[in-house]
C-alpha cells in the first residue's frame, strides 16, 4: 500500500502505534498553527476538540501510548507556538522585557493546555462549543491587557504577610 515497503516503514517507525502517534501529532500541530491568530484561535481550538471527540478512540490510543510528560510537552509546545504568534500579532511595537513576554506566553498557553487536559481527563464530557466559548470569554481582551500592563507598569509587588517568606 502507498508504495512503502515493510523494511522502509520499520526503518522510520518501530511499530504502527508510532506511526499513528506521528500522524496525530502532525495533524494537531498543523491545525493549531492554521488558526494561530487572535481572531481565529478559539474557532481552531473548538474544531480541534470536535475532531478529537469524533476520533475519540484514536485520540485516547495515542494519548495513552505516550507518557504523561510526553503528551503534556507535546501540547505545551504546540499551543505555545500558537500563543507566541498571537502575542506577536497583538504586541506590535509594545516594549516588553523578554522574560515578561515569555511569562505572558506561558501563562496563556498553560491555561489553554490545562483546559484541554481537564476535558480529556473527564472523558470529553464537556461540550466542545460551550467549553471553548467559556475559555474565550475569559481570555477575550486579557492578552492585550496583560501586554499593556507589563509594558506600562512594573508588575505589582507581592504583598507579603508577617511570618511568610
Region locations from a protein language model:
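Primarily secretory-pathway and cell-envelope proteins
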Residues: 6, 37-53, 140-143, 148, ...
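Amphipathic alpha-helical packing segments from all-alpha helical-bundle domains
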Residues: 68-93, 99-114, 144
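Solvent-exposed, amphipathic alpha-helical segments
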Residues: 27-34, 51, 107, 111-122
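C-terminal peripheral helix-coil segments that are non-catalytic and often amphipathic
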Residues: 88, 118-165
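An amphipathic alpha-helix adjacent to DNA-recognition modules
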Residues: 3-6, 10-36, 46, 53
Amino acid at each position: 500500500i502507498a508504495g512503502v515497503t515493510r523494511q522502509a516503514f520499520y526503518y522510520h517507525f518501530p511499530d504502527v502505534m508510532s506511526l499513528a502517534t506521528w500522524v496525530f501529532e502532525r495533524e494537531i500541530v498543523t491545525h493549531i498553527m492554521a488558526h494561530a491568530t487572535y481572531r481565529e484561535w478559539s474557532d481552531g481550538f473548538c474544531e480541534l476538540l470536535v475532531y478529537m471527540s469524533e476520533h475519540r478512540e484514536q485520540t485516547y490510543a495515542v494519548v495513552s501510548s505516550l507518557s504523561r510528560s510526553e503528551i503534556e510537552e507535546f501540547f505545551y509546545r504546540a499551543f505555545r507556538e500558537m500563543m507566541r504568534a498571537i502575542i506577536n500579532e497583538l504586541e506590535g511595537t509594545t516594549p516588553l522585557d523578554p522574560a515578561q513576554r515569555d511569562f505572558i506566553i506561558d501563562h496563556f498557553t498553560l491555561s489553554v493546555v490545562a483546559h484541554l487536559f481537564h476535558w480529556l481527563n473527564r472523558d470529553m464530557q464537556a461540550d466542545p462549543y460551550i467549553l471553548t466559548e467559556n475559555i474565550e470569554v475569559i481570555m477575550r481582551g486579557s492578552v492585550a491587557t496583560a501586554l499593556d500592563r507589563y509594558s506600562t507598569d512594573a508588575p505589582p509587588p507581592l504583598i507579603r504577610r508577617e511570618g511568610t517568606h
